[in-house]
């Protein structure tokens, strides 16, 4: 098993707050179209690449530090911080792996026995000297007296992972289910161009029975809090699995709107970033479709299926003088 970490990046956490002040009182502020004025200030610095930032019921910011492998709580009033958890089994080598998504259970600090925090991280599943990168979700219990997270329980593990397009956002939905975004693992792209994209792949019943999650790439998953497949998940092509929607490239933003609709923000191939309304059983088209499917300069080329060995392919990049 190998474990690596990148040097910390010195990043600033900046929050924007509305304030009824004049431009003279807020020389660095920004006025929104509705007349609201936003001001910014540094709340915390020198964090290890903050990835998830969410408001907790304790009026603190809860933050995952992707390359420091920590969950840190920050008081926005004075910037004081408290480390709730440091993980020692995260594998991280690139800009899209490490300790990523975090979801606070709605019952956190409500004395209902569900002081739960869900964390998404990559790890090395190889027991030897090699590396087999995988992704898992664990549930931790928060101890308000000690202000720490403990008692980890694995919700799901052995999910495919790579060094790019990991997705990794997690939410607890209004229905009490977990929603987890999964990217296409950077396949068919840059250094990973010889890896096949699995965003359109769907599991067989045998794969689900064997807990083989190879097709869980380029998807939004929906899980029970214990990792089980919800009974009301969509049946897609005859199989019910954790898959809620598919055909996605790299959905890193995931949120529920005020009416209960689920939205995802998705990175496109250097163009066609999307805001998607995520619906049960829907196919969002990737890699055959990018954006509105109106970009005639985009065509899917599956390098892994080339008759010439993929690793020996050579690429020439040109910029046309005029576009159709």
Per-segment meaning from a language model:
Residues 1-10:
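Bacterial N-terminal signal peptides that target proteins for export
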Residues 11, 40, 89, 157, ...:
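A general structural-boundary detector
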């Amino acid at each position: 098993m190998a474990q690596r970490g990148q040097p910390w990046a010195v990043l600033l956490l900046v929050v924007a707050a509305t304030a009824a002040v004049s431009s003279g009182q807020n020389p660095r502020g920004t006025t929104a179209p509705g007349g609201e004025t936003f001001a910014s200030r540094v709340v915390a610095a020198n964090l290890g690449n903050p990835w998830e930032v969410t408001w907790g019921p304790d009026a603190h910011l809860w933050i995952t530090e992707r390359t420091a492998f920590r969950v840190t709580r920050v008081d926005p009033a004075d910037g004081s911080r408290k480390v709730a958890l440091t993980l020692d089994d995260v594998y991280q080598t690139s800009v899209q792996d490490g300790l990523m998504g975090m979801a606070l259970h709605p019952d956190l600090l409500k004395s209902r026995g569900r002081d739960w925090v869900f964390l998404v991280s990559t790890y090395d599943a190889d027991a030897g000297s090699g590396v087999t990168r995988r992704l898992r979700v664990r549930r931790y219990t928060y101890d308000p007296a000690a202000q720490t997270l403990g008692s980890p329980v694995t919700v799901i593990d052995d999910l495919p992972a790579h060094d790019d397009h990991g997705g990794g956002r997690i939410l607890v939905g209004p229905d009490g289910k977990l929603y987890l975004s999964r990217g296409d693992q950077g396949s068919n792209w840059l250094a990973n161009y010889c890896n096949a994209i699995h965003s359109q792949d769907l599991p067989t019943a045998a794969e689900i029975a064997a807990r083989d999650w190879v097709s869980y790439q380029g998807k939004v998953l929906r899980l029970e809090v214990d990792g089980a497949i919800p009974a009301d998940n969509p049946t897609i092509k005859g199989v019910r699995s954790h898959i809620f929607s598919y055909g996605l490239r790299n959905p890193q933003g995931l949120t529920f709107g005020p009416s209960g609709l689920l939205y995802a923000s998705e990175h496109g191939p250097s163009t066609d970033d999307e805001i998607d309304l995520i619906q049960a059983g829907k196919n969002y088209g990737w890699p055959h479709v990018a954006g509105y499917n109106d970009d005639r300069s985009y065509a899917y080329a599956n390098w892994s299926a080339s008759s010439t060995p993929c690793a020996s392919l050579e690429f020439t990049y040109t910029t046309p003088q005029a576009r159709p």
